[in-house]
Regions:
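Conserved CoA-thioester-binding segment of acyl-CoA-metabolizing enzymes
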Residues: 1-61, 82, 96
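Glycine- (often His-adjacent) and acidic-residue-rich active-site loop
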Residues: 3, 60-97
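PAS-family sensory domains
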Residues: 100-101
Length: 101
């Protein structure tokens, strides 16, 4: 895995093939903006293909796991059909990539 390609996710390898993934926006309670949302959607295919990882654990930096979607992102998307459609596809990818991992 190329951990350096991710800006809002941190990675830590632990013993026995455990990969700890930390969502790293503690100032926003790890709410997913466009950047994090995209990273979360694509990371699972890489985790699944990584021969060093047997299990992945996801957590949040700071005091919260995640506040969910960043409301500023939602406001930016309002009225933009193409952005909303892209985000909905990405949301589907995120869920199915986790399931397939």
């Amino acid at each position: 895995m190329k951990f350096s390609e991710y800006e809002q996710l941190r990675f830590e390898r632990r013993d026995h093939g455990v990969l700890l993934i930390t969502m790293d926006r503690p100032d926003k309670y790890n709410a997913a903006d466009e950047q994090m949302h995209g990273e979360l959607a694509r990371v699972w295919a890489e985790v699944s293909a990584d021969p060093e990882t047997r299990v992945a654990v996801i957590t949040g930096a700071g005091r919260a796991f995640s506040a969910g979607g960043d409301l500023d992102m939602v406001r930016r998307m309002a009225g933009d059909h193409d952005r909303v459609a892209h985000m909905l596809r990405e949301m589907s990818d995120l869920v199915y990539n986790i399931i397939n991992c």
